[in-house]
Amino acid sequence: MAKKIIGFIKLQVPAGKANPSPPIGPALGQRGLNIMEFCKAFNAQTQGVEPGMPIPVVITAFADKSFTFVMKTPPATYLIKKHSGVTKGSPKPHTDKVGKLTRAQAEEIAKLKAPDLTAADLDAAVRTIAGSARSMGITVEGL
């Protein structure tokens, strides 16, 4: 018989830097889960990823105090900022432009984000990424 699920916990944790301090400790502690076990497992799985890159993770908590977790791809905004070389988006995205993103860079981001996007094909995924970039005040060339 399947284990009884008591809840889902969604967090964004920097790759390789999971520790029991907030927000991880309180979120897992409320449900009685082993915080250090999660931290060690998460850090082990994110060893090959750029340190500090935010990784969304969905933790499934079970009634017997065990858990499983699924890592998602990094947020599109983080990848867009990294590829365009800006530190933050524009406060007025449609009037003040802060950076540029080429179609090739948008395709690279779309390929990386493909498992988490609902787009039917690569072109639709590229348009999704381009829309996110435009809403941050970043010009997308080639679209």
Curated annotation (Swiss-Prot):
One of its GO terms (molecular function) is large ribosomal subunit rRNA binding. This is Large ribosomal subunit protein uL11. It comes from Janthinobacterium sp. (strain Marseille) (Minibacterium massiliensis). SMART domains: RL11. One or more lysine residues are methylated. Forms part of the ribosomal stalk which helps the ribosome interact with GTP-bound translation factors. HAMAP family: Ribosomal_uL11. Part of the ribosomal stalk of the 50S ribosomal subunit. Interacts with L10 and the large rRNA to form the base of the stalk. L10 forms an elongated spine to which L12 dimers bind in a sequential fashion forming a multimeric L10(L12)X complex. One of its GO terms (biological process) is translation.
